[in-house]
């Protein structure tokens, strides 16, 4: 049996270092066993999935050197490799489960399910589906289907007993069936949920080993049941430890930049980032810290993965990147520097911004430096304003982050409109609103136009600089966050409308 592993990202955001981490271990496991590593795009969430996100994911993984033998961009014997192009496949499998008695129709409305969960919580119970669809007679089901009532298809789950499955790192895992919900397999719009599409595709694409994050452990019983219901062999499971911040919390963009593009943009070498991800819970047999992808594949043993949450420490990554830089010849370093900022359009944008401000070419260094720096040197005192209160400064930065993060169209028109709308909704004059953004992005109020600067440096560096500025002036507490989220939404409403802030 040929080993086949896969990475199956969802194109709903910027490419995450966690995706690269899981992809790396899947690739090493497959190659160490003489197998194949494939890439599949799981874009069943049609509302949030975008072609731009998919392309960024493919580009960032390629940049790292994580190459796949089958995928949406290279094809293969199991094409298509986008779930959105496989939609005709899944419904029949869901209907087959109905025929075999392993799944059932549910006609409960969203309001009925909300009421069900509220009543369960009031009784001190963990909210879960109560099986009401199982109580319907065949005649009633057929009548409601014929009437065209909206419905979903759910899988049946045992009410008692223990689900047992083996994990490469954890041995035998036991999860009570009482903790497993009757998962929706096919939604009211006829589209599959992650669980159905994932299992069907892994089987049809002959995946033999599934290496994924440990957050999917609670889903393993559902997947095991589906494999049993279909009569298929289940792939060997391996749930990898999650990457964590230095404070041991789950890695999140609030505390550490998580986009692969961010690390590329600040000048981390792809070999160094891949090397660092390879050290996340794993080590070379000789404990060396600097190694290549080829080295890792050659010496890879999944049993060397530690289940302790690996810490993603940016300072350690920077140190390791320094080791890789120091190993280059001066000529190689020059090539890397030139390729790092070689995009002619970006350089033209910078030249356009600084041209009205310089009389000598040598003056370009001072005006353009912040475009290339990792982070500007800023202090809390720099954000003190005679026009805005400290809370207004903090809120303007946080609200801008939230609104900008929701955009995939990153151009001057979009960024400018978001910031101008926010200033207007907060009832702040634009000339009083913008200094905080000049300081956060450029480190000074004397700078090139900041909205265009944000476009030029790109979303990842923009978010990182805005978050750092927010940390310096005072990031919101958990209690404040809840209030601010509602306030931010209420600001978007017409002046005569409000939201409940209780």
Curated annotation (Swiss-Prot):
GO biological process, alphabetically ordered: glutamyl-tRNA aminoacylation
Entry-linked Pfam families: Anticodon_2, tRNA-synt_1c
Motif 'KMSKS' region in this chain: 250-254
EC number, as in UniProt: 6.1.1.17
Enzyme class: ligase
CDD domains named among the record's database cross-references: GluRS_core (cd00808)
The UniProt record lists the keyword Magnesium: no
Subunit: Monomer.
Alphabetized PANTHER family for the sequence: GLUTAMATE--TRNA LIGASE, GLUTAMATE--TRNA LIGASE, MITOCHONDRIAL-RELATED
Protein name: Glutamate--tRNA ligase
Organism whose genome encodes this protein: Acinetobacter baylyi (strain ATCC 33305 / BD413 / ADP1)
Gene name per UniProt: gltX
């Amino acid at each position: 049996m040929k080993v086949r592993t896969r990475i199956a990202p969802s194109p709903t955001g910027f490419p995450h270092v966690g995706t690269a981490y899981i992809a790396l271990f899947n690739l090493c496991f497959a190659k160490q066993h003489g197998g194949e590593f494939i890439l599949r795009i799981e874009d069943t969430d049609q509302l949030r999935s975008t072609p731009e996100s998919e392309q960024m994911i493919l580009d960032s993984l390629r940049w790292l050197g994580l190459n796949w033998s089958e995928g949406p961009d290279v094809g293969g014997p199991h094409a298509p490799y986008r779930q959105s192009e496989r939609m005709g496949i899944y419904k029949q499998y869901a209907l087959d489960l109905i025929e075999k008695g392993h799944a059932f129709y549910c006609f409960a409305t969203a309001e009925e399910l909300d009421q069900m969960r509220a009543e369960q919580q009031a009784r001190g119970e963990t909210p879960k589906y109560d099986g009401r669809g199982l109580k319907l007679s065949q005649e009633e089901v057929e009548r409601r289907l014929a009437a065209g009532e909206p419905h979903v298809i759910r899988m049946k789950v045992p009410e008692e007993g223990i689900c047992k499955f083996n994990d490469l790192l954890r041995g035998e895992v036991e999860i009570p069936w009482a903790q497993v919900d009757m998962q929706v397999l096919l939604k009211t719009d006829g589209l599959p949920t992650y669980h159905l599409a994932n299992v069907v595709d892994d089987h049809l694409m002959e995946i033999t080993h599934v290496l994924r994050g440990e957050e999917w452990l609670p889903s393993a019983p559902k997947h095991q049941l589906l494999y049993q219901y279909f009569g298929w062999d289940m792939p060997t499971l391996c749930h990898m430890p999650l990457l964590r911040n230095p404070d041991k919390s789950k890695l999140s963009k609030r505390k550490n930049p998580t986009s692969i593009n961010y690390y590329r943009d600040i000048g981390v070498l792809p070999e160094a980032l891949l090397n660092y991800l390879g050290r996340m819970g794993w080590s070379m047999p000789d404990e060396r810290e600097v190694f290549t992808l080829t080295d890792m594949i050659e010496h890879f043993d999944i049993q060397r993965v530690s289940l302790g949450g690996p810490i993603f420490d940016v300072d350690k990554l920077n140190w390791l990147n320094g080791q890789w830089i120091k190993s280059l010849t001066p000529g190689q370093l020059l090539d890397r520097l030139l390729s790092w900022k070689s995009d002619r359009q970006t350089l033209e944008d910078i030249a356009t911004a600084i041209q009205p401000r310089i009389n000598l070419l040598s003056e370009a260094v001072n005006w353009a430096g912040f475009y290339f720096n990792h982070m500007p040197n800023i202090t809390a005192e720099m954000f003190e304003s005679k026009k805005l209160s400290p809370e207004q400064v903090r809120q303007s930065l946080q609200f801008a982050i939230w609104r900008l993060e929701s955009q995939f169209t990153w151009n001057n028109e979009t960024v400018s409109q978001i910031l101008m709308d926010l200033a207007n909704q907060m009832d702040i004059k634009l000339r009083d609103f913008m200094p905080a953004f000049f300081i956060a992005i450029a480190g000074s109020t004397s700078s090139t136009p900041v909205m265009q600067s944000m476009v030029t440096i790109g979303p990842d560096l923009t978010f990182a600089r805005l978050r750092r500025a927010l940390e310096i002036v005072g990031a919101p507490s958990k209690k404040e966050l809840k209030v601010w989220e509602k306030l931010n939404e209420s600001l978007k409403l017409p002046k005569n409308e409000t939201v409940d802030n209780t």
